[in-house]
């Protein structure tokens, strides 16, 4: 009986891990060309405009992904955008300046394109002005499901690109320290 329960638990755990597994098929491939728009309405071409620096892209298709995406905001801000106040830091506060590109990319495709203007305005109104340089909008017919292996619309996806625009790491879902540690390891090694 114990063997059966253990086997069922093992299969269930494998199913859960597989369901939340990032898109490994994208790793090692060039990030597909994507034209986005920055906060000021100017075109930003991914990955062309990011070449020369490592890049972290956070991409979401729907408001259903917003909850998981929000779990990343503070850790990303604290690591890459915010500055440590030296007067309040103690000896254990270690801050490293990362020279990387960072973009949050809400994606408006298919039916969502019809509401993209109002959705963009809503996102802009709720976004801290300090984060405007890190916000891009994709508004297009192409979903990139095949190239980037997006499995769920209610999940945010994260891509680390090398200096040439090749995907070197992917993850998805809620923030956890292990995911951030892998991202930081890549940035620190390069």
Each model region followed by its residue ranges:
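Positively charged n-region of N-terminal signal peptides that target proteins for export
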Residues: 1-4
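Bacterial N-terminal signal peptides
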Residues: 7-16
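N-terminal "domain-start" segment that seeds a small globular fold
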Residues: 21-47, 68-71
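Short active-site neighborhood of thiol/selenol oxidoreductases, capturing the structured segment around
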Residues: 46-73
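Solvent-exposed loop/turn segments at secondary-structure junctions
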Residues: 63-65, 108-112, 141-144, 167, ...
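Structural microenvironment flanking redox-active thiols in thiol-disulfide oxidoreductases
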Residues: 65-128
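Thioredoxin-like thiol-disulfide oxidoreductase module
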Residues: 111-154
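Thiol-/selenol-based redox modules, centered on thioredoxin-like
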Residues: 145-146, 153-190
């Amino acid at each position: 009986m114990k063997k059966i329960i253990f086997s069922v638990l093992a299969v269930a755990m494998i199913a859960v891990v597989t369901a939340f597994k990032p898109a490994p098929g994208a790793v090692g491939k060039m990030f597909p060309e994507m034209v986005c728009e920055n906060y000021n309405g100017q075109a930003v071409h991914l990955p062309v405009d990011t070449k020369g620096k490592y890049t972290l892209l956070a991409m979401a298709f729907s408001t259903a992904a917003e909850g998981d995406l929000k779990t990343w905001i503070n850790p990303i801000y604290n690591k890459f955008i915010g500055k440590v106040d030296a007067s309040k830091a103690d000896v254990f506060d270690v801050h490293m300046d990362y020279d990387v590109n960072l973009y949050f990319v809400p994606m408006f495709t298919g039916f969502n394109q019809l509401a993209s203007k109002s959705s963009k305005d809503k996102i802009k109104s709720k976004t801290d002005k300090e984060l405007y340089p890190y916000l891009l909008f994709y508004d297009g017919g192409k979903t990139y499901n095949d190239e980037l292996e997006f499995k769920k619309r209610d999940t945010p996806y994260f891509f680390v690109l090398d200096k040439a625009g090749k995907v070197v790491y992917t993850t998805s879902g809620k923030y956890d320290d292990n995911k951030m540690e892998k991202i930081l390891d890549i940035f620190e090694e390069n």
